[in-house]
């Protein structure tokens, strides 16, 4: 909970976690036991081959990693796994590679289970000492491939050196037969340990463990401890953390010293503690940039401090209950006093005369510095050290430590100090070292920490502080009796609820929820704790919108939390740096207003109005949003009791609301980047005040609002791109609400001069040279209420239709066309349909054709620019608008849906459903199926309805993922069997089959081949298909978007024998027409991709018989003489393959010569040379030589 680092400012919060991650994989036993046995038995066989060895190692690693979160499941199997591997190690016949592999497997197990559990399983008899030592002789500390071996050997040695015999007994006679003296065992072990303390790999950690076990032995400490400490301190003093070698050396020394002072007896280590502390001071570790060194420094300092102080349990500490169940029952028995705080019954500490060594002050000082370190792991270690030290100090000195910790919570300190202070307080509280007399001070700073949020640049810091503050509350719940915390229950419970619901960071919300749950369970004094927990549990608070808008309303239903939650939103969240939090806070205030409307109106609303004039942009923005939401909430409350909103708001508040826009305008706050936020906020204010029916009708304020909306729509191109859409939407929504409330004279009649000028003004803006202005005013026209459109409908539809048409000057204005289509659709919904109605007031028989023309015309918008296929936005809007219009007509006036119109709509949508962009294909499929299955009433004249319903049954529609090509294309290609849809589906498929995206090409091609396979035996259907295919080609000649892809598709169809049935007939019309179209397509073309595709098609067409074959070969030989070398080479290569494929193409006598010419000629040589070889081929194959056509002389 508290170990999470501060998240990066740019990191987006993960609101929804994957269920599999949340649940994790709960295992019950080691299920791979048999596989592991087999794997270990196979090591002697696989270790010789590198590939087999790596496969075995990777498989074992995968098996072990599966148990990283539940390593205890391995415990029953550790012994046999270790024995199997050590047998390989101890076998004298094992090769070095096999030994290293066995140690590598041992390390993998150790990594999962932890070395401390693993140590006790190593063989540790006297007989093992010498073999383990001997194994080190063959080790090279610089060999990076075998570091696992050295690591495991050091751990093994650390166990074997614990044998209960003096090492001198193992040495015997140290003299050898050659007169040399052998090194004593004790010295050998120490030399090994010292040498590995300065290596750069993992063996350094194991060497520190070895030192701690070895140096603290009774026989070794007398002879070697002083000299080792002297060596390590000298090495430490002469090392610098400015170099890599120095960092490695210092890390090893610090680890060794920390382990010695942890495992050694106090009386053995005490004589050296002061010297070590002085050396450590001289190293200046807090100045190091290496986290590991600073952490080890703090760890060593605290262990030195614990060495200075006698190990004892402070008699003055606060105790809640006992570890013994029997003792707890005695305390709870009748007649027994339940004194929990021993200091209350003791006027003096039994050890008050205990002399505290001088070094303790230095240790405490360094630990307090560690609390402010920049890294969490260092602060965490320092906090634990503070807790351990305070537990051995007299009461007064421990209280001074608590006071020093509380000094971390000043606003001059950084967020690091606050975080470290919270961790320290949690440790002190958990250990009973924070006496109840200090609780009032501690709770005060913790409440501040729970809302700590400091602005830093474009974001803020403090999430880790709030998280740690939740940990303090969690620790206090376990540490204190309910009566001790009773005075603070209201404040703590409210603060935790606020953090759980309103904190921006998901980890903090979850930490607060956990702390609240712990307090409810342990203390039992939190108001409505169980009810709140069931709603605001760990998983529920994961979604921030759910927290702000739903959970907060439930909790605010309990009066203890209502006002604190509202006050927190106003004071801390309305002015938050994150715009999303400000918007959510405003909506949350809207939802909370019904709980205490009088408090909101009398106290909160005046404060919000004052904040609207703040010089801080974020405060001003949030306050305006909040005023808008609260006003609308008060209006809804007033409406329920047939009252006016002014019954809640006094005249001063109403006037202040009216003046917000003018005050911002006078201060020029609508300009620049901040102006974007102000425009957005005031547009929302306009919308909410209009919906709240504020009494501003006929007031100049309304004119000011109208000016702001118009100016915002007109200047959208000046708004940053990421905010543009949102600002346009809020301005349009404001316009709708404003017109509906303030421009109505009588029901259904416009009553303002501004209203009458609005439509002509907006229609004029539709011709603006700025695309965004067209977008804004198109959307505005679409959002106008029906009474304003009455009498102007034809004029508006004509203006919007001009926006949707492509002209040479606005080809790239795809967004304007998209918004124009949406506006037309929205207007149709607004004015309604009446077949015989007036065309200037409703959609009727006279103007429906104009609407159809606009929508269907945009279905063929394939505009592309630097952003890609921007026309897809237009086509998507056209599909949606057509669907909405068709459904509207079906419900009201189905007679206006004519058969040819319905057929065109369905065919156009089917074409889009077979194209290459996944998202738009899926949208088209949804539109197509909606139109097909709509039954209220059914849409008339749908072509092939019965066949479509059998192909796309209603029950199966929901299960198909239309975004996935593998699921979409097998269904879409079935439409090729329906003559009405064949042309359009084939047109769409051509783009998909000939596209670039691998998955789309593969699945669309496969589905097309499956269809073609099914019609091979039906000559009539195949003939119809081929005619449609040629029709598509003919209609899209020189349209590179379709023709290039179509050529690729034709190549695939020819190569897969889809037209084999036509090859039996000489000069088949399909081949003749296809050749004509290909020649026309590539005539004078310089498009390399198109030319290459056409070469492939021409080579595939050679399979057809008759005179047409000669014409095809002539065309190919023309390409062999093409001006582009790359085309000549490509043609020669494919013709070579073609000759190999179709053996009847060339006479056997000349085959070798033809193949030789094709393969040996340098087709990228000069044109005269190439054409000579090309002509030679023509002669060999009996094809007329191509003749150069002289260029006409100008003026001749």
From Swiss-Prot:
Summary of the function given for this chain in its UniProt record: Tubulin-folding protein implicated in the first step of the tubulin folding pathway and required for tubulin complex assembly. Involved in the regulation of microtubule polymerization or depolymerization, it modulates microtubule dynamics by capturing GTP-bound beta-tubulin (TUBB). Its ability to interact with beta tubulin is regulated via its interaction with ARL2. Acts as a GTPase-activating protein (GAP) for ARL2. Induces microtubule disruption in absence of ARL2. Increases degradation of beta tubulin, when overexpressed in polarized cells.
Family to which the UniProt record says this protein belongs: Belongs to the TBCD family.
Single Gene Ontology BP annotation: negative regulation of cell-substrate adhesion
Classification via SUPFAM superfamilies: ARM repeat
Pfam families, A to Z: ARM_TBCD, TFCD_C
Keyword Cytoplasm: yes
Protein name: Tubulin-specific chaperone D
Keyword flag Chaperone: yes
Molecular function GO labels: beta-tubulin binding; GTPase activator activity
Placement of HEAT repeats on the sequence: 363-401, 599-634, 752-788, 1106-1142
Gene3D superfamilies, sorted: Leucine-rich Repeat Variant
One cellular component term from this protein's GO annotations in UniProt: centrosome
Source organism superkingdom: Eukaryota
Localization in the cell: Cell junction, Tight junction; Lateral cell membrane; Cytoplasm; Cell junction, Adherens junction
Record note on quaternary structure: Found in a complex with at least ARL2, PPP2CB, PPP2R1A, PPP2R2A, PPP2R5E and TBCD. Interacts with PPP2CB. Part of a supercomplex made of cofactors A to E. Cofactors A and D function by capturing and stabilizing tubulin in a quasi-native conformation. Cofactor E binds to the cofactor D-tubulin complex; interaction with cofactor C then causes the release of tubulin polypeptides that are committed to the native state. Interacts with ARL2; interaction is enhanced with the GDP-bound form of ARL2. Does not interact with ARL3, ARL4A and ARL4D. Interacts with beta tubulin. Interacts with TBCE.
Keywords on record: Cell junction, Cell membrane, Chaperone, Cytoplasm, Cytoskeleton, GTPase activation, Membrane, Repeat, Tight junction
